[in-house]
């Protein structure tokens, strides 16, 4: 079964997302973080997880969700519980493959991107329930 090609609107949204992720990575680098991974995906199906950026500063590993919307308020409100679970699954899979990070603290951050605004980094945006 062939799926239809993505619409132009979908392609444009993907491009905007990639630009936002690039800006977020740059912003985090300026704050002293190193980027360990971008566009991290783990697994398939219902157990799949994904996270936009994995960043490290010292003994801290941050799994970062990047949200780009018309306003920063819309961006922060756009993270769903389902998306959080996918990020948490990807984080667990990443850490399982990287035993050298076992002694690091782990945090879930967000970087919000909106037109004509500096990115906003929200450290410790949520904790695992």
Curated annotation (Swiss-Prot):
It comes from the Bacteria. It holds the Pfam family UPF0102. This is UPF0102 protein amb4503. Belongs to the UPF0102 family. HAMAP family: UPF0102. Signal peptide: none annotated. One of its GO terms (molecular function) is nucleic acid binding. It comes from Paramagnetospirillum magneticum (strain ATCC 700264 / AMB-1) (Magnetospirillum magneticum).
């Amino acid at each position: 079964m062939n799926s239809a090609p993505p619409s132009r609107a979908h392609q444009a949204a993907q491009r905007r997302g990639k630009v936002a992720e690039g800006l977020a990575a740059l912003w985090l680098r300026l704050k002293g973080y190193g980027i360990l991974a971008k566009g991290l995906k783990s697994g398939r199906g219902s157990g799949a997880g994904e996270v936009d950026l994995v960043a490290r500063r010292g003994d801290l590993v941050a799994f970062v969700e990047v949200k780009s919307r018309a306003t920063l308020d819309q961006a922060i409100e756009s993270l769903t519980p389902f998306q959080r679970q996918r990020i948490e699954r990807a984080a667990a899979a990443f850490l399982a493959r990287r035993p050298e990070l076992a002694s690091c603290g782990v945090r879930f951050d967000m970087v919000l991107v909106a037109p004509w605004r500096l990115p906003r980094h929200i450290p410790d945006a949520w904790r695992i329930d």
